[in-house]
Structure formats: structure tokens, C-alpha cells
Amino acid sequence: MFHTFLIKYAEIGLKGKNRYVFEDALVSHIHHSLKRLDGKFTVTKEAGRIYATAAEEFDYDEVIDALKKVFGIAAICPMVQLEDNGYDDLKAKIVEYVDKAYPDKHFTFKVNTRRANKQYPHTSEEVNRDLGEVILDAFPETKVDVHNPDVLLNVELRAKRINVYSLVIPGPGGMPVGTNGRAMLLLSGGIDSPVAGYMIAKRGVTIEATYFHAPPYTSDRAKQKVVDLAKQVAKYAGPIKLNVVNFTDIQLYIYEQCPHEELTIIMRRYMMKIAEELAKKDDCLGLITGESIGQVASQTVHSLAVTNAVCTLPVFRPLIGFDKQEIVEISEKIDAYETSILPFEDCCTIFVAKHPVTKPSLNVIHNDEKKLSEKIDELMQKAIDTVEVIHIEA
């Protein structure tokens, strides 16, 4: 019975004169999301409302699933649109709506009328009362409950038509991707970084990604795991450019030249340097990591300060105060968890010291990095010049 979806947004409504930029971006993303499905949809914007209307038969569950992955959507409301053919016709159509939408009539309800068309000849209170009466007359087993109803029947009286809906499906929230700049995600095969990318994309940021590969110490299966995680993030964030950096020579050279308790922090600093270079090439305005304070030795406050010192771009860490279980729950929600726990090691887990430093000194790290001489710069440039680019589609 539903061929139209009312799509609500939240934060976008708080924008000022540039609100149309966010609305247009959201309309575009909704259109792109539905275009991949069977069935033709038109997506329109009208007076603070966005409508997606089907021109032919479609899979209802597929549509809901697709829309729940579009950032910027606060709620999805399957609805019917009625022509304004008079008050008696509205009463008859409401009874028809309830009859089709709710086969089991044992429920409590409330009618909630929004009179956007101020010229409508009846007040909201009158419509609430009169529609409630016809529902009770038609279906005596129903009951009115204005405080905690099972069904909230929304009636929007607009200038050209009347919208009726009672199901409100939560959307992902956030802002439309692409309305808030571009940033580079340091993506590994773990649980955290895909979640970090998801969360920053939710704030409207276009995501690119960099993965550090260390063959033969990391396998092609480890690389494919990261590609699969990028695909999962792309379902929400849209297309992602994935840079695959061969980090083997850099990693081995650091391992040979530097104290082993500092390996992780020094390797991390060079990863940040390379990611920043790639970010600047593509006009990214920041880096994104999945770090959370105290989770591992390289994520203590002292370690993060030393890592940050190597960057000129801002580093966004959306998981910084999260417990691991909170991160896992988001990973499961975006269907990344089962892939993240596949047992293929990445370069961050192979060259790990038994007793890594947890309170590194920036001066000490600087002195130890001097041992790497000019050769490390050559290795970095080679890694940047030989990057493999994989374009990930949603």
C-alpha cells in the first residue's frame, strides 16, 4: 500500500541560508541509493520535506535497508498521499488506511494532525477528534490513548495534498556525505578503524583511506580483508579511494635501526607521515584513526602526543573515549565485525615488541629517528610513488 516515503532530517533543519546545499546533497544521495534497486523512484524536495516515490513495484525491505545507510536521514516514514477531496473523503480514506495497515485492530491509537496549510477549514484539534471518532466507529476494538499509544497516526494537511503515516523508522542521522570536506582514514584490518571511518563519514566528511601492507609478512588475504572492510564502510560513506602502501622496507629498516621497545611508536609516526602526504595530494583536510585512549601501548596519552607531533594536519579520533565493547557494538551494527576478526595479521601486529614503551619521550624518539638518516626519506618516497590505488564502490 505504500509507494511514497517521507524522509525526515534533523540537523539540516538548523542550518541557515545554506540549508539548501545540505538538502540538495541529501536528495542526491537518496536518489543514488535507490537507483541501484529494482523499481524506479523519483526523489523530490518540498517545503522542508523530502519524498521518494515509486513509479513501479519494488522490494519494500530493500528500500528501507538502503535508506537506513544514507547519512542525513533522521527518519523514514512509509506513507500514503491523498488528494484533498473534502473532509468526508478524508475520513473515509483514514478508515481505509487503518484497515489495510493494521489487520489486527486490537491497539491503542492517537491521531496527530499537523496543519501546514493554514487555509484548511478545520483546526488540528477538530481533525484529531473527528478522525478518532470515525476510527472508533469503524473498529470498536481499538482504543484511544493520547499519552502512550501503540499507533501514532500522523496526518499532515498540506497545500496540495494530505500525507498520512504511522510508522517512523529511525535513520542513521548525521549529515550528508560530502558537505563537510574530505579526510584520510588510516584503515587496518582491525575492529576500530572501520568504525572510525563510519563515524566521521556520518558527520558529512568524504572518506579516503590508506592501508599499510607488508608483504610477504602480510598476506594477500590480509589485504583482501581490508578491501572488504572498505566496501562495508562505503555502503554508508559512498565510494572510497583506497591507497595500498607497501610498508615492508620501511618497517624492516626501522626494526634494524631503532630500539625495539620504540618500534610501534616510530612505525606509527612514519605511517602518519605517509598518510599525510597522500592526504595533501588529494586535498584532504585531516587524518582519521581508530585510536582509543589506553587501549594498547601506542594509544596512551603520552604515545598519542608523540604520534601527533609528526602531523601538520589535524587528526580526528572519533573513538577516543570509547570502551572496546562500545566500538564492537558499532562494528556489529555496520556488519564489519565478522570481517574484522578474521585471523589475518596486518603490519601493525607483526613487528611488535614484547615490552613496548607506554610513556615515550618526544626528544628520545627524535634522537632515535636520527639513526634512520636520509635512507628513510628515500624509502618513504618510494612507498608513496608505488602506491596501489583501489577504487571501492558502495
Locate each region found by the language model:
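A conserved beta-strand->alpha-helix junction
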Residues: A230-E256, D346
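RNA-binding accessory domains that recognize and position tRNA/RNA substrates
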Residues: M1-M184, P194-I240, A309, V357-L362, ...
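Small/polar glycine-rich anion-binding or flexible loop at a beta-alpha turn
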Residues: Q295, P343-F351
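Conserved G/P- and acidic residue-centered "switch" motifs that form tight phosphate/ATP-binding loops
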Residues: G190
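Structural beta-sheet core signal
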Residues: L185, A209-Y211, V244, T289, ...
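Active-site adenylate/phosphate-handling loop in enzymes that bind or generate adenylated species
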Residues: E133-I135, V168, G173-N180, Q251-L252, ...
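A short alpha-helix-loop-beta-strand transition element characteristic
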Residues: D335-P343
